[in-house]
A protein has these predicted regions:
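Conserved glycine(s) of the Walker
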Residues: 13
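Small-molecule kinase domains that catalyze NTP-dependent phosphoryl transfer to phosphate-bearing small molecules
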Residues: 108-143, 161, 166, 170-179
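Switch/connector loops and helix/strand junctions flanking conserved nucleotide-binding motifs
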Residues: 64-67, 92-99, 144, 175-178
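P-loop (Walker A) phosphate-binding loop of NTP-binding proteins
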Residues: 9
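Hydrophobic anchor at the beta1->P-loop junction of P-loop NTPases
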Residues: 6
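Post-Walker A helix-loop "phosphate-sensing" segment adjacent to the P-loop in P-loop NTPases
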Residues: 23-30
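Conserved nucleotide-sensing/catalytic segment adjacent to the nucleotide-binding pocket
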Residues: 30-33, 38-74
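Single conserved hydrophobic/aromatic residue that forms the stacking wall/gate
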Residues: 185-194
Length: 194
């Protein structure tokens, strides 16, 4: 059985990722209450169970107790139940923009500001990011790019590549691209004398 927990920041694309995993043949459940998780895992861990690929969306909606999730994951480790955690993240400014576009309120902002809710959420789910098998930053991803990444990880059986090399052209006067980790070469054409 392949058991995937899809989690991450609100607005980073968890629901979209779950829909894509469902299209890839996964049995998907979104926003399962954490107290039901042990029974859910136990039910689908039986060898004669027909469902072999499960994706479970867990997030901060509904004020779930993430301390309880840590205990459940520890218990799964003790029982040697294999699972993978897919953590979807995005830059704060991108998350704020997405909330503005949808005109939805962040689950932890209450009647306050979205950026305050994002900061609270980052703090609460940091332990999940630390335990994550895969971390995807969706800040600059299009939906089709997210689908390709998920297919690489969950369908084609390819190992997740931690090193990507992208050759791109940019002008320093506009700044280094924000998704660039390292700019190795700066090539300028010398001025021509004629």
């Amino acid at each position: 059985m392949r058991f995937v927990i899809v989690t991450g920041m609100s607005g980073a694309g968890k629901s979209t990722a779950l829909k894509m995993l469902e299209d890839m043949g996964y049995f998907c459940v979104d926003n399962l209450p954490i107290p039901l998780l042990p029974r859910f895992v136990e039910m689908f861990s039986e060898p004669d169970e027909e469902v072999k690929k499960i994706a479970l969306g867990i997030d901060i909606r509904g004020g779930q107790d993430f301390g309880g999730l840590k205990d459940v994951l520890d218990e799964m480790d003790v029982k040697e139940i294999e699972y993978e955690i897919l953590f979807l993240d995005a830059q704060d400014d991108v998350l704020i923009k997405r909330y503005k576009e949808t005109r939805r309120q962040h689950p932890l902002s209450g009647s306050g500001r979205v950026d305050t809710g994002i900061a609270k959420e980052r703090e609460k789910i940091m332990f999940l990011k630390m335990r994550a098998t895969y971390i995807l930053d969706t800040s600059k991803m299009l939906t089709r790019e997210l689908k390709l990444e998920l297919e690489k990880i969950f369908v084609k059986g390819q190992n997740f590549c931690n090193l990507y090399i992208t050759v791109m052209s940019f002008g320093f006067k506009y700044g280094i691209p924000s998704d660039s980790d390292l700019s190795l070469i700066h090539i300028s054409e010398p001025t021509r004398p004629y």
